[in-house]
């Protein structure tokens, strides 16, 4: 799996076991991702932070 980095068009190959790509957004600015990368389990959203996860190459 390859996930986008925060600075397009760069991406990285995920290590074994981290088979989701994710975008992390601040709820206050939910259009601009704060962090992107590979993760094993999609984190739960909180009052301040929203996560969007997906499982195909460079889908974040």
From Swiss-Prot:
Keyword Secreted: yes
The organism's place on the tree of life at top rank: Eukaryota
Pfam families: Toxin_cobra-type (PF21947)
Keywords: Cardiotoxin, Cytolysis, Disulfide bond, Membrane, Secreted, Target cell membrane, Target membrane, Toxin
Cellular component aspect of the GO annotation: extracellular region; membrane; other organism cell membrane
Subcellular location per the Swiss-Prot or TrEMBL entry: Secreted; Target cell membrane
Entry's Gene Ontology BP terms: killing of cells of another organism
Keyword Ligase included in the entry's annotation: no
Tissue expression as described in the entry: Expressed by the venom gland.
One Gene Ontology MF term: toxin activity
Cystine pairings recorded for this chain: 3-21, 14-38, 42-53, 54-59
Note: Shows very weak hemolytic activity.
Family (UniProt): Belongs to the three-finger toxin family. Short-chain subfamily. Type IA cytotoxin sub-subfamily.
Quaternary structure note: Monomer in solution; Homodimer and oligomer in the presence of negatively charged lipids forming a pore with a size ranging between 20 and 30 Angstroms.
Function: Shows cytolytic activity on many different cells by forming pore in lipid membranes. In vivo, increases heart rate or kills the animal by cardiac arrest. In addition, it binds to heparin with high affinity, interacts with Kv channel-interacting protein 1 (KCNIP1) in a calcium-independent manner, and binds to integrin alpha-V/beta-3 (ITGAV/ITGB3) with moderate affinity.
Listed name of the protein: Cytotoxin 3
């Amino acid at each position: 799996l390859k996930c986008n980095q925060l600075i397009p068009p760069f991406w990285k190959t995920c290590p074994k076991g981290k088979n989701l790509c994710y975008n992390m957004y601040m709820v206050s600015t939910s259009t601009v991702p704060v962090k992107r990368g590979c993760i094993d389990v999609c984190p739960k959203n909180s009052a301040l932070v929203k996560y969007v996860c997906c499982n195909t190459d460079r889908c974040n």
